[in-house]
């Protein structure tokens, strides 16, 4: 029988998959076995798998068909040391980013979903992409550069379309320019 922490993590992965399925009207599922089957020391497995198989074994969520660049990890924990994010030395967050980025390709949209007891849900995304928010924590990882931590509902309210766009295109520079141009005139963050 799985440990209570593993069950909690699996439950959160299913919750996120269901949320994404409902949000985008496309099938997202919890990855089978949910682990880095093609990450870390298992990179060589990519040589014998086709794109769909690789996508199925990246991260915790198998994305819908129109999200080929989507790479996600889900973490559900009792607590989180937010104060260490502010000091720039959060080993827990660094370990999660290591896990997320171990299976990442250069053009992937990498997103870390986090849930903490009595604190809520959050997303952590790379700041190299343009995101619409006025409420965030900024974190610089020594290994993985700059990230934003944003409250879950606020993030999805303002970035739902950007997630789909970034997950489907590899030319993020032109996406950023056109999406920012379209969003700024009508931006109302509150």
Give the ranges of each region predicted by the language model.
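Acidic-basic catalytic patches of nuclease active cores, encompassing PD-(D/E)XK
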Residues: 1-48
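Active-site beta-strand-loop-beta-strand hairpin of nuclease catalytic cores
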Residues: 24, 57-73, 79
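Short Gly/Pro-enriched turn/cap motifs at secondary-structure boundaries
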Residues: 51-53
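Phosphate/NTP-binding elements of NTP-utilizing enzymes
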Residues: 55, 76, 96-99, 106
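Short beta-strand-loop-alpha-helix junction that forms the active-site gateway
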Residues: 74-91
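Basic, flexible Lys/Arg- and Gly-enriched helix-loop patches that mediate nucleic-acid binding at interfaces
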Residues: 87-97, 101
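Nucleic-acid nuclease catalytic cores
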Residues: 104-132
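Intrinsically disordered, low-complexity terminal regions enriched in charged/polar residues
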Residues: 128-190
């Amino acid at each position: 029988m799985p440990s209570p922490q593993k069950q909690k993590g699996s439950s959160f992965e299913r919750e996120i998959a269901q949320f994404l399925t409902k949000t985008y009207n496309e099938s997202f599922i919890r990855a089978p076995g949910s682990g880095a089957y093609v990450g870390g020391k298992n990179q060589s497995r990519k040589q014998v798998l086709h794109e769909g198989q690789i996508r199925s074994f990246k991260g915790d969520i198998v994305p819908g068909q129109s999200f080929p660049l989507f790479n996600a990890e889900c973490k559900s924990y009792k607590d989180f040391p937010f104060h260490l994010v502010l000091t720039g030395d959060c080993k827990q967050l660094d370990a999660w980013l290591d896990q997320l980025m171990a299976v990442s390709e250069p053009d992937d949209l990498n997103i870390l979903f986090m849930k903490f007891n009595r604190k809520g849900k959050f997303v952590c995304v790379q700041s190299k992409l343009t995101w619409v928010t006025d409420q965030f924590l900024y974190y610089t990882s020594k290994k993985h550069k700059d990230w934003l931590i944003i409250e879950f509902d606020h993030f999805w309210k303002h970035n739902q379309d950007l997630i789909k766009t970034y997950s489907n295109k590899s030319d993020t520079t032109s996406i950023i320019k056109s999406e920012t141009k379209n969003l700024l005139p009508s931006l109302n963050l509150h």
